[in-house]
Amino acid sequence: MKCQMQVSKLLNVLAVSIGLTFVYSTSAFAVDADAALSMARQNGCLKCHAVDKHKDGPAYRDVAAKYKDKDHAETVKKLINHITSGEKAKFPDGHEEEHKIIKVKDVAQQTNLIEWVLSLPGGKWPETD
């Protein structure tokens, strides 16, 4: 009987732990689209990018399409590095320029921006990439 109570308590603790893990893991990827778009505007991202059309930089939907089948965590890490390090951006005509570094230093806000871009329904990525 005592063993049965211990097993029951253990199962209850396990169930609560699994439930909390699910809640935190799903809320961790909740995207604030308004905040992301506002941040993109404030940091001048929309001078070179648009949600659904190519400018000097690719459309955000096309970026989402490019990384759709890639490892998500690695993609987020790579794209955060891209917007915070000034690494070279390649243009369709072949020239390269340093990518503008965003002003926002809060990793959560940077991640929200990237998660928003990746959440957009895909466009297409040019075959030349």
Predicted regions and their residues:
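Bacterial N-terminal signal peptides that target proteins for export
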Residues: 2-15
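The canonical Cys-X-X-Cys-His
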Residues: 42-52, 113
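Axial heme c-ligation environment in periplasmic c-type cytochrome domains
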Residues: 47, 56-67, 81-111, 129
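Electrostatic cytochrome c docking/interface patches
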Residues: 26-40, 66-70
